[in-house]
C-alpha cells in the first residue's frame, strides 16, 4: 500500500507539531520544577488557615500573616483538594513579595503544575516522535536498477 505525497506531508507536519509541542511542554515543566526548587531553598514559612472554599474546594482561600506582620488572603490554586474551612496549613512565600508568591506546602500545589506539563510533554513528544519514526520506516526503498 502506498501513501500519497500529500498525506505524507500532512503526517510529517502533524508528527513534527506534536514533537515540538511535546518538547515545549517538557521544557516548560522542567523550568517550573527548577524554579520551584529554588523557591523552596529560600522560602519563608508561616502558619495559615483555610478561611473559605472556592470552586468547590479546589481553590481554598488561605489567610496568613507574614514575618513582617502583613496580613494576606489569597485563593490557592493547583492540584489540591480535601481542605476544610478552619484547617491550619503551612504557607511558604518569598520574603520580598509574600502576597504574590504564597503557596500552601502541599505536593499538588508545589509540584502539580510541573508534573502536569512534563507528563503531557512526554505524551505529546512520544506520539510525535513515533509518528516521525513511522513515516521514516514507511518510505519506499529504491532497489537501484
Curated annotation (Swiss-Prot):
Keyword Transmembrane: yes
Entry membrane topology: Multi-pass membrane protein
Keyword Kinase: no
Principal cellular location given in the protein's record: membrane
Disruption of the gene: reported phenotype: Deletion mutant together with deletion of toxin Tse4 leads to a significant loss of fitness advantage when placed in competition with parental strains.
Disulfide bond residue pairs: none
GO cellular component, one term: membrane
Alphabetical keyword list: Membrane, Transmembrane, Transmembrane helix
Cellular compartments annotated: Membrane
Segments traversing the membrane: 9-29, 109-129
Protein origin, superkingdom: Bacteria
Function: Immunity protein that plays a role in preventing early activation of toxin Tse4.
UniProt-recorded name of the protein: Immune protein Tsi4
Lineage: Bacteria, Pseudomonadati, Pseudomonadota, Gammaproteobacteria, Pseudomonadales
Amino acid at each position: 500500500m502506498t501513501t500519497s505525497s500529500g498525506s505524507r506531508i500532512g503526517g510529517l507536519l502533524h508528527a513534527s507539531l506534536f514533537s515540538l509541542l511535546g518538547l515545549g511542554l517538557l521544557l516548560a515543566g522542567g523550568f517550573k520544577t527548577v524554579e520551584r526548587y529554588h523557591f523552596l531553598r529560600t522560602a519563608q514559612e508561616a502558619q495559615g488557615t483555610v478561611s473559605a472554599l472556592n470552586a468547590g474546594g479546589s481553590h481554598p482561600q488561605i489567610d496568613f500573616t507574614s514575618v513582617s506582620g502583613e496580613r494576606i488572603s489569597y485563593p490557592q490554586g493547583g492540584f489540591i483538594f480535601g481542605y476544610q474551612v478552619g484547617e491550619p496549613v503551612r504557607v511558604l512565600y518569598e520574603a520580598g513579595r509574600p502576597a504574590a508568591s504564597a503557596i500552601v506546602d502541599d505536593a499538588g500545589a508545589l509540584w502539580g503544575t510541573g508534573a502536569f506539563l512534563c507528563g503531557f510533554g512526554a505524551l505529546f513528544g512520544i506520539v510525535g516522535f513515533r509518528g516521525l519514526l513511522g513515516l521514516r520506516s514507511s518510505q519506499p526503498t529504491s532497489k537501484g536498477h
